[in-house]
Curated annotation (Swiss-Prot):
SMART domains: PP2Cc (SM00332). It is an enzyme of class 3 (hydrolase). This is Protein phosphatase 2C homolog 1. Binds 2 magnesium or manganese ions per subunit. Has highest activity with magnesium, but also has activity with calcium. InterPro entries: PP2C, PP2C_BS, PPM-type-like_dom_sf, PPM-type_phosphatase-like_dom. One of its GO terms (molecular function) is protein serine/threonine phosphatase activity.
């Protein structure tokens, strides 16, 4: 997304920001006028022998001043070279280009963590191989392009799952004891529980690929684990907690400079009840039941100091709530940075994300209040986004708290979803993207059309685009109960013996592959080996992100069927 010490510049004519360029002529010493030897003509500057002759003919005071100037200039040049990783090879001596480093990958860590050893699935899916089933109500298409004319490396990753974790039953206990697809550890007899709950994500890396690759392999697993432990917590809060956890784990790794923007979406089946307190007009049954049980328990405790009444109030409330509940399709989103998610509703583009850029007034105020500053629309003059995962060296300013939304899908009007990095949005508006692919029923073809359009419009960044085409007829059948319900604990299709989530099944396959290769993934030896590998990776770590792009477009947010949770945005 952004050019940095590990990425090539977007334009050869602007290979390095002006603030980082060093004029080689500043290292030449120009003797002051008044010297007896220079009253008739000036000697050419820049040569070694010229400087030596000038020093021999100049007074001692001038020699000392010039020596001090040369020392300071040399020190400045050395520091600039180290911070920007300037190349000093003869082939590149004519211009200051960033040194080409091998992209950081997680291959060396795969032997220590099954999640990091999962092979790429179809369409280069970082989460592994995930395919639709006859009961799937959506189809995913993904196209990515390095943009080789402008980029030497591909720093984007993406992930998706067709059968993400099932929606928990109301008042389910923590750790997923009552949750479909998560009650048992995967084993040889385990099978994937078909949930029709989708997970989609795009990670746009900068200053190397490490953070983006790590998130592509791990974020959905962290999210699933948090959802299992908090089955009655609203999903937007769980998304915020997941991003915070990911940020904390990345900060502990030695690769401090790598970071990524992120946009993720969850498409879930939920039993929901009407709610006047929700912007969507309804709320999920599980959190509502938990809140009602807690409220009734508190009132009973005040009337009678009997603690058992609080715990027994839940089952008595649940039947009343279930009578009002209806099955609905819900889309949850979360993003940090400038990757976007767009929902097409009746042909209109609805943006369900927020561009966290230095040009945004709200984000600029937040950065200033945190002790930073915005220079040339960049955080401290370095990073073009104000929120990201990773970037530990700027973590006091660049937070990982996401912007979250909650949208109830309207099957009669909601057609498809677009997730893409800024490589597309820099040259294409939200509505243009919708208009380009609205009449393209195939999701894969639609994603390719958008990437090709961005290349034709001279996008200078890596390109990743994901299109999720909704099967409106299938959604209507489930909502109208003309088809068997799916996705929520308690449904007949969820009652699978030794059933596990799709993510758990993929990890189990990777663990078996490691076992067949006689590679241990636990114990002190594995942990020590993991730390040794990580510390070795630090030696080749790219420098901080240096963005050459200057985007002045102000973000616009579509306020439709959305709720904000822990966004920190006024």
């Amino acid at each position: 997304m952004f050019s940095g010490s590990s990425s090539p510049p977007k334009d050869k004519s602007n290979s390095v920001p002006h603030s980082g360029a060093v004029d080689t002529q500043s290292l030449s010493v120009h003797p002051e006028e008044g010297s007896a030897a220079q009253t008739s003509k000036s000697l050419p500057s820049g040569g070694f022998f010229t400087r030596r002759t000038s020093e021999d003919q100049a007074p001692a005071g001038e020699k000392k001043r010039r020596s001090s100037t040369v020392t300071k200039a040399a020190t400045f040049f050395t520091n600039a070279k180290n911070s920007l990783s300037l190349s000093s090879s003869p082939r590149e001596s004519s211009s200051f280009n960033y040194t080409v480093r091998s992209p950081q990958t997680l291959q060396s860590l795969g032997s220590m963590d099954p999640a990091l050893s999962v092979p790429q699935g179809s369409l280069n899916n970082s989460a592994g191989d995930s395919l639709p089933t006859p009961r799937s109500s959506f189809k995913v298409g993904v196209t990515e392009d390095r943009n080789r004319k402008c980029r030497r490396t591909m720093e984007d990753t993406h992930a998706y799952l067709y059968n993400f974790l099932g929606t928990p039953a109301p008042l389910a206990r923590a750790d997923g004891e009552n949750e479909a697809g998560s009650s048992l550890a995967p084993d040889e007899a385990s099978s994937v529980v078909e949930t029709d709950n989708g997970y989609f994500a795009i990670f746009d890396g900068h200053a190397g690929t490490f953070a983006a690759e790590w998130c592509g392999k791990k974020l959905h697993l962290i999210l699933e684990d948090i959802m299992k432990k908090n089955p009655n917590t609203p999903v937007p809060e769980l998304l915020d907690q997941t991003f915070t956890t990911v940020d904390q784990q990345l900060e502990k790794l030695p690769v401090k400079n790598s970071g990524c923007t992120a946009v993720i979406a969850l498409l879930r089946w939920e039993d929901r009840i009407p709610s006047s307190h929700s912007a969507t007009g309804s709320s999920a049954l599980a959190p509502a039941a938990a809140a009602a049980a807690a409220a009734k328990g508190d009132s009973n405790s005040e009337a009678d100091d009997t603690p058992t009444q609080a715990t027994s109030s839940g089952p008595s409330i649940l039947p009343k709530l279930q009578e009002k509940a209806i099955r609905q399709r819900v889309l949850y989103t979360a993003n940090v940075g400038d990757a976007r998610i767009i929902l097409c509703r009746n042909g209109k583009a609805l943006r369900l994300s927020y561009d966290h850029k230095g040009s945004d007034e709200n984000e600029g105020k937040r950065i200033a209040n945190a002790g930073g500053l915005i220079l040339n629309n960049r955080v401290n003059g370095v990073l073009a986004v104000t929120r990201a995962l990773g970037d530990a060296y700027l973590k006091d300013l660049v937070t990982g708290h996401p912007y979250t939304t909650e949208t109830v899908v309207q099957p009669d009007s909601d057609e498809f979803i677009i997730l893409a990095c800024d490589g597309l949005w820099d040259v294409c508006t939200d509505q243009e993207a919708v208009d380009l692919v609205r009449n393209v029923p195939d999701a894969q073809e639609a994603s390719k059309i958008l990437v090709d359009y961005a290349l034709a419009r001279f996008s200078t960044d890596n390109l990743s685009c994901m299109v999720i085409r909704l099967d409106t007829n299938r959604v209507k059948e489930v909502i109208n109960k003309t088809a068997e319900p799916i996705g929520v604990a308690g449904d007949p299709s969820m009652d699978v013996e030794h059933g596990v989530s799709e993510a758990d099944k993929i990890i189990e396959g990777a663990r078996k592959s490691m076992a067949n290769a006689d590679i241990a993934d636990d114990g002190e030896t594995a942990e020590k080996g993991k730390n040794d590998i990580l510390h070795k990776m630090v030696d080749g770590e790219p420098g901080p992100e240096m963005s050459l792009d200057d985007s002045n477009d102000a973000p616009t947010v579509s306020h439709l069927n959305k709720t904000n949770a822990n966004n920190g945005i006024p």
